[in-house]
Amino acid sequence: MVVQPYLSIVGWARNDGYTPNYAKRLEHALGFLVRQLDKHKVPSEVIVVEWNPPPDRPLMAELLGSLGGAGHVSVRVIVVPPHHHEGPQGWRKRGMHVNNAANVGIRRARGRFVTPKALDTFYSEQLVSRLGRLDLEEGYVYRCDRLDARMEDESWLDLPDDELLESLARRIFHRNERLTHSIDWKMRDLHTNACGDFLLMSARRWLDIRGYQKDPTVLCLDSDSIALHAAAAHGASEVHWRDECIYKIIHGNTHAQRTATIWKNWQIRLDHYLIGRNRRELAMALRVWLDYPRRRVRGLEEIVAPSIERNFVAKAARYARNDTSLVTNDADWGLARDSLSERTVLRAAWDAP
C-alpha cells in the first residue's frame, strides 16, 4: 500500500538537444536531488514528465543510470505521447509545452505538498534542510530566490555534491530578487521573479487553481506568476524564504534573455503623452484593453504573444480582489482523463509496489 509522500517535485524533460549534454545534466541533477532529499530524510517523489519524446531518440528513463537512493525518494517518469503536443501555436518548432507538461505531473502528484522544478537547477543545502523540517503549512505558498551562475565548461558535472554547491555560490552573477511592481498594476505584492523554479504549496491549492493556465501557444509566458497570484486569491499567504535559494547554471537558451517587447510608434507616443500628463492609470488600462506592447521570443518570432499587461497584470488585478471566478484552465487539466505510460526508476521504502 502506497503511503502519501510529504513532498512531490515535478519536472519536465525532452531529449531533443535543447542544451548541450542534456541527458548527462539531467541525470546529474536528479541524482544530486535524490541524495539531498535522502540526506534530510524527506519522504518525497520526483516526477519527470517526458513530454513529446522524439521518436529517433531513447526515452529518458532508458538513459538514467543508477540514482542511488537511501529509501526516502521515489522517481517516476511519465511519458506523454507526441499527439498531445499538437495544436498550440508554435508546436512544430518547439517540442516542449512547459505548462502542459508540468500540469501532467502536478495532477498526478501524490505528495501533500507540490512544487514544480526545472530539472537542471540545484537546491541549496539550506533549502533542502528547511524542507526536511517537515513543518510546511497548507495555508501558505513558499518562495525563495533563484541565483544564476555561469560555469566556464562542463567540468562541474564531475564535482562532488558539496564542491558543486561551493562552486555555484562563487560564480553567482545575478540574483532573481523580489521585484517592486508598479502601483498602477493594482496587484498583490508577491515574489513573482523566477517563481516557476520554486512555487511550493499544498496539492489541494494546486487543485484549487487548476495548475498552470491553459496557453494557446508554446511560449507559456507569465504562467508561474499567474499561478502565484491565483493561489493568493484562493487564500494562500506567501512566505519568502530569504536564506534558502536555488542555483541555475545559465546557458544561451535561458528564457529572460530571449524575450523582447514590440512597440509601435503610435503606442509609444500615446503612452508618453498620458504618463506625461499624470494619466498613468489610463495608460495602463489602454495597454490592457488594446494589448500592447506585445512580445516576441527569439527563435519563435512568428508568434506575437500578448502584452504582460493583458496576459498577466489584468488577471493579477482580479486576483488581488479575490476574484476566484477567474479560472485559467479546464476541469480536466493535466490530461486527467488520459492514461499515460509511467515507469518508476527509483522506489522509496514508503512506496510499496
Predicted regions and their residues:
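N-proximal low-complexity "stem/linker" segments adjacent to membrane-targeting elements
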Residues: 1-38
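Cell-envelope/extracellular polymer assembly enzymes that use nucleotide-activated donors
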Residues: 6-10, 45, 226
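Short beta-strand/loop segment that forms part of the nucleotide-sugar
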Residues: 42-55, 76-83
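Active-site-proximal specificity loops/subdomain of glycosyltransferases
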Residues: 58-108
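Conserved catalytic core of nucleotide-sugar-dependent glycosyltransferases
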Residues: 93, 106, 124-215
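Conserved glycosyltransferase catalytic-site signature
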Residues: 98-103, 120-121, 128, 194-198, ...
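C-terminal catalytic/acceptor-binding lobe
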Residues: 187-188, 193-195, 215-353
